[in-house]
Amino acid sequence: MLVIKNLIFWLLFSLHTLFFFVVLLLSAVLPARLRHSVGTVWAKGVVGLLKSVIGLKYQIEGLENIPDTPSIVCCKHQSGYETLALQAIFPSQVFVLKKELFYIPVFGQGLILMSPIAIDRKKPAKATKQILEQGKKRKDKGFWITIFPEGTRIKPGEKGKYKLGAARMARALQMNMVPVAVNSGLFWPKNSFLKYPGTVTFSIQSPIAWDFGSVEEMMQQCEQKIETAQAKIEQAVHQQ
């Protein structure tokens, strides 16, 4: 039954994505924020499909920790689920992502129209410059910025190296950092066709001020907040 539900999901996902890709292309001449709203509706629609077809939904801890002003969301990255659900949880945001994603047929063209901050991970020095330059432009337009500080998807129970890019951007743009833990990998395994029913937890931690300590101390604080919450929400699922 799970396989059948996943097949149905992927069929509906494809139709849903094709429709919104056409809409997004037609909206290419519109201002960035209007184009972005189209992508947000698409993302929320996919989250709805996952809930209704697969039985995969989410809950939020720490909703009161979301600031009133645009900030930098530093989120654990375990699956594609958070790239969708975060758009329903936080205000209009752009993602920091690797530029190679632009080369994916259809999906890549849609990404470009969503005004992300694209970086070249093979050239760290250049990537930092790109984050700061493009980040300022997005901030000036009122966007929040979402970044995955470990730079890639991490399996549940594991931890990657936290890079300084988010803290450097926060310091340069004077934007606070909002650490977020998420256990989506327990229900949407890396490189898996199957998604599993359950409740993903997003644990939003108290913000880190952009002028807190040094850049290294900011990132250490972010890592500590995420990993502490991460252990709790993953353990909670295992104990069910």
Regions found by a protein language model. Name each.
Residues T17, F21-T40, K51-V53, D68-P124:
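Catalytic core of membrane glycerolipid acyltransferases/transacylases, capturing the structured
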Residues M1-A28, E64, K137, E217-Q240:
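Membrane-interfacial terminal anchoring regions of lipid-handling membrane enzymes
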Residues S52-E61, T128-K129, N183-L186:
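Short gly/ser/thr-rich secondary-structure transition/capping motifs
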Residues E61, L97-K98, I119-R121, P149, ...:
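Thr-Gly-centered strand-to-loop micro-motif
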Residues K129-Q240:
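Non-catalytic C-terminal accessory region of glycerolipid acyltransferases
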Residues I60, V73, F95-V96, F202-I204:
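Generic preference for hydrophobic
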